[in-house]
């Protein structure tokens, strides 16, 4: 059975994708650092930053405990760059989003090496990166 949401349809391999995102986060919430521990009230979930469940790009998926998921749902989104100063964990994901928007390399290693330049580009500040790639 295909899982649906208001924003679209989850891919058929969603459970595998979500399991991988949680594993890459070390079984911990990337926002608050709590380990997955349902007995203590910390169940790890996967959040789509652009609210589109069909978009499973690495920069769009974050492992969050349910508490953080509910806190950021609809508040921390790609189109709100002012969040960057208050939310350091968010920077790499926004940089990946901008790399995709500007048709630049989107692999995690490349994006992480160019985070600040990508954010500058996304916020309308020219960068040598645009010319160099």
Language-model segments: residues:
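Polybasic, low-complexity binding patches
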Residues: 1-9, 36-38, 42, 49-63, ...
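Short cysteine-rich loop/turn motifs with clustered Cys
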Residues: 13-44, 65-67
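Bulky hydrophobic/aromatic packing residues
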Residues: 14, 30, 84-86, 133
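Short helix-coil boundary/hinge micro-motifs
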Residues: 16-25, 116, 120-133
